[in-house]
Regions:
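ABC ATPase NBD coupling module
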Residues: 55, 67-88, 113, 125-129, ...
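Helix-to-loop junction immediately C-terminal to a conserved catalytic motif
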Residues: 51
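Conserved ABC ATPase signature
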Residues: 130-134, 138
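Walker B catalytic motif
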Residues: 159-160
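The feature captures the beta-strand-to-loop junction immediately N-terminal to the Walker
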Residues: 36-38
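ABC ATPase C-loop
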Residues: 147-148
Length: 233
C-alpha cells in the first residue's frame, strides 16, 4: 500500500531546545495511527513538525512521496494535510456556521456544510450560536469539521477527546471510523487510551522525543504490560 506519510530521522527544535531526536515512522494511505506517550514525550511537536510549525527541522518528512521538511506551512497544507490543534482555535465572535465557512478549499472533495451537519447534528442545531456559547464538545466538533471542509485527506488530530463528556467522545469515535471507511489517513495524538485503542490500526509510543515502541492493533493485548510500564494505562 502507498505511504501517505513517511518520516525518517526527524529532529526538531523550539529555539535552542532540541525536542525530537531521530523520529522514524510511516503511515499508509487509509490508516489510522496513534502516537501514545506521556505529556512532554514529543507527540504534539511531531504533528507540529509535520505541518512546519516548529522552529527548525532536520531529517525527512515525505507526504505522498514529496519531501516537505523545507516547505513552508501553507504549501504543506496544499498537499492535502489538515491539522486540528489541541487548543481548537475557534473564532469566538463568529457563529458556528461562519467558522465553518472560513477554511479555503485546498483540494477537491472537501465536505459540504450539509455533510458536516449530517456528521455532527449538534452543530446543525447550534449553527447560529457564537463560538463562545458552544460547549467544549461542540467546539471540538467544529474544529475537526473545519479541516474536513478543506479537502484534506491526511488529518493530524491532537488530543481531540481531551476533557470531553463520554457522549461527545463516542460521537468523535464514530466520526473517526466513518472517515476511515471513506479513505482518510489519520494520525492521532491521544492520552485517552480507551478512546484510541479500538480505532487505530497501529500504535507508536514516544518517550523523550523518540519512538520507543511500535505495534499493530492485533498485538495490543500482548503489549499491555509494556504500555502499562511506559504510560501507566
Amino acid at each position: 500500500m502507498a505511504l501517505a506519510l513517511e518520516i525518517s530521522k526527524l529532529q526538531a527544535w523550539y529555539g535552542e531546545s532540541h525536542i525530537l531526536h531521530d523520529v522514524n515512522f510511516s503511515v499508509a494511505e487509509g490508516e489510522v495511527v496513534t502516537l501514545l506517550g506521556r505529556n512532554g514525550a514529543g507527540r504534539t511537536t511531531t504533528l507540529r513538525a509535520i505541518m512546519g510549525l516548529t522552529g527548525r527541522r532536520e531529517g525527512s518528512i515525505k507526504i505522498h512521496g514529496q519531501e516537505t521538511v523545507a516547505m513552508p506551512t501553507h504549501r504543506i497544507a496544499h498537499l492535502g494535510v489538515g491539522y486540528c490543534p489541541e487548543e481548537r482555535a475557534i473564532f469566538s465572535s463568529l457563529s458556528a456556521e461562519e467558522n465553518l465557512m472560513l477554511p479555503p478549499a485546498l483540494k477537491p472533495g472537501g465536505m459540504s456544510v450539509d455533510d458536516i451537519y449530517q456528521m455532527f447534528p449538534n452543530l446543525a442545531e447550534r449553527r447560529h450560536s457564537q463560538g463562545t456559547r458552544l460547549s467544549g464538545g461542540e467546539q471540538q466538533m467544529l474544529a475537526v469539521a473545519r479541516i474536513l471542509r478543506t479537502g484534506a485527506k491526511l488529518l493530524l488530530l491532537d488530543e481531540i477527546s481531551e476533557g470531553l463528556a463520554p457522549v461527545i467522545v463516542q460521537t468523535l469515535a464514530k466520526m473517526i471510523l466513518m472517515l476511515k471507511k471513506q479513505g482518510y489517513t489519520i494520525v492521532m495524538v491521544e492520552q485517552n487510551f480507551r478512546f484510541a485503542a479500538p480505532l487505530a490500526d497501529r500504535f507508536y509510543v514516544m518517550e523523550h522525543g523518540q519512538i520507543v515502541e511500535q505495534f499493530a492493533a492485533p498485538e495490543l493485548a500482548a503489549k499491555m504490560n509494556v504500555l502499562n510500564e511506559l504510560l501507566g494505562v
